[in-house]
């Protein structure tokens, strides 16, 4: 696989008889060369270093084609005219004036019944032509990703550029570059100066990521291991809840009653009692759990995923309103004498739409929780993590490299307040 010298995020398969495609992946990731900037438009250049007469190779329309893989989140965008729009991409020759190859859809797609995880759309060249350098320009992608905020999944999750069995003729004759395009400028022929953006691939192996340092959870472990009473942990599938759950497995002094949804307990322990409980369940379910197990302390770590826009279906909105606003409040009111410690993760994202449905619910929830906690003198901590481009509850013991320094600063303070 080739590697690009910029940020990680692109995967290229070597063009050869065995691996006959160029693979561009991680278009949905926030920590990649495309990532959060994909909605600004991206240029991908396939530079064929030697002119090749395709007609002399094989008279096959499938010799060279492009495959777009649409992510499952595409269905939330309602893209009625995405495929019909011919400006999804353009193919330019090196002189930037002549359209080299026109592409057409292999088949029509019915978006009204979009239930598959992925939908693959393939474009074939209509005619075989003698080609030299090909420039593939993804135009105005902000129309198709649904939002300009990082963290949302893009519609186009990957792009594959395929060659047929004769692709060995392309071996060692290709050079690939990429360039982010300013969305405020129209894409016109004389605007593109590709020579300044060439990137030479120097290695066939992907480099080892050196910035994989993990925060030492010694402080967290020491705090939790001092707990000498039965405790009920609500949450734990992600983030600090998961860390607490795993560390509790080492503490054999007390009984731990841990609610879970899909998470797995990494270490077996005779004092860990998993209780299947979903925060979408009614509060009565939790009543039975608490009555049966009599925990002396309750920790709340639940943290739902982030959505940035106002396009959520009504059913999802109701669920998120419940999990953010109603459930923590009910929990505090109901069990205020049970020595609850509330840990409420609430990300502050600098690119978040402050007028979105999610933001309003989160703000109301924080205000209501703070009011109840102060009224009953319940220890609580509303944590605003550093601005992340993913869900708000990234593990404190294994944060993303982009937020590592911020977590190192905030980590001791957060843990001391929780425990």
Where do the protein language model's features map onto the residues?
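Catalytic loop of short-chain dehydrogenase/reductase
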Residues: 304-309, 313-323, 339-374, 384-393
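Rossmann-fold scaffold of SDR-type NAD(P)-dependent oxidoreductases
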Residues: 234, 295-305, 344
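HotDog/MaoC-like acyl-thioester-processing domains
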Residues: 1-4, 58-121, 157, 161-235
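Conserved glycine-rich Rossmann-like NAD(P)H-binding loop of the short-chain dehydrogenase/reductase
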Residues: 252-266
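Catalytic strand-loop segment that frames the active site of acyl-thioester-processing enzymes
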Residues: 1-37, 104-134
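Rossmann-fold cofactor-recognition segment
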Residues: 269-284
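C-terminal helical subdomain
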Residues: 382-383, 394-419
